[in-house]
């Protein structure tokens, strides 16, 4: 399945910096749409339906959600939510920052009510010894990451945080599309054949 994603990275940023930045961008986008795109929103049946969420967005810890709602916490909480929210501390790939002492991950996903996850991000690992330890622990082939390891060994990687946001997912949520393919110019959906 093909999709469009916007990725960004900020040197020396914290997770909180990125989360606040994303909240500003999302709220600003929704305000602009309400102000400048009234006619288009009316065509889509969304005029007056877009609400600008309050900041800061609520933050949940993934471990606590799983303990309270079980493995399928995502579907339950997404359906119950009225505004966008963050989920933090998600075990992921080696490049997300992990505190070995606490076992917590310094990362975050943004979820949209009734739709699901739209953005994933994290503070990044930059220290060579931690990257190698995590690659070994997770059984990841180091030769696949030669350049990254070389840069880390030479202390050429700076601390940073960033994220990637699914553009079509965001648009689908705004217009309440039934399927993400409905907001793609040229949807390529596995198993779907379109007549020309």
For the regions a language model picked out, list residue spans one by one.
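A translation/RNA-centric and nucleic-acid-associated enzymatic feature enriched
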Residues: 1-31, 53-196
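Short, highly charged C-terminal tails/helix-capping segments
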Residues: 39-55
